[in-house]
A protein has these predicted regions:
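Intrinsically disordered, low-complexity segments enriched in small residues
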Residues: 1-192
Length: 192
């Protein structure tokens, strides 16, 4: 009952319920699925759907009370193609046939950061981007990297930040309650 781990080593083949012919057919089918829509996801990763979701009002905006077209009109500044311009190299997660991950180049614009940050995923971009009316891509890369390194879930953190901004918007909280920091929609410096 207090088993902590099991380590197995060897070179015996592990039998499967399906034969090698079926495995080859399944592999071919899954690799073929990478064409078309899957190819787009492979190329850009989940940031490739960010601007589409914003344009269709499917991405959260202003704590789910706004519309990206009006409240975050420059959301296209964070579209997948622009994210790729800041990407150094690609990688794939283990056993994932899409392999959409990316390692970012060093940042030298509004935010200076070291090379090696992971490409932000759609959920991070939506929760810290359109949800907070933030169209600064480098801030999204920095926030994504900070959350990853600290073990913080970006969806929950972005939602909490939106609630905080809404409290400021309605006068429930002020800068005096927040160590002098004013929180306004779209203020990427306050977000970071």
């Amino acid at each position: 009952k207090r088993l902590k781990a099991v380590a197995v080593q060897g070179d015996m083949e592990v039998p499967t319920a399906v034969g090698p012919e079926l495995m080859k057919a399944l592999r071919k089918k899954h690799v073929g699925a990478l064409s078309g829509h899957w190819r787009q996801l492979h190329e850009t990763g989940t940031p490739g759907i960010y601007d589409m979701c914003c344009s269709m009002d499917d991405a959260p905006t202003k704590n789910y009370k706004g519309v990206a077209e009006f409240d975050s009109p420059n959301y296209a500044d964070c579209r997948g193609e622009i994210v790729l311009e800041k990407q150094k190299r690609r990688y794939g997660c283990w056993r994932c046939p899409i392999a959409c991950g990316g390692i970012m180049k060093a940042g030298n614009g509004d935010y200076v950061y070291d090379e090696g940050a992971h490409k932000p995923e759609y959920e991070t971009m939506a929760m810290f981007g359109s949800n907070l009316c933030n169209d600064n891509l480098e801030s999204l890369i920095v926030v994504s990297d900070l959350c990853n390194r600290l073990g913080v879930d970006t969806i929950s953190a972005g939602a909490s930040m939106a609630f905080l901004m809404e409290c400021f918007e309605h006068g429930i909280l002020t800068a005096a309650d927040n160590d002098g920091l004013e929180m306004k929609w779209g203020d990427h410096r306050a977000i970071v």
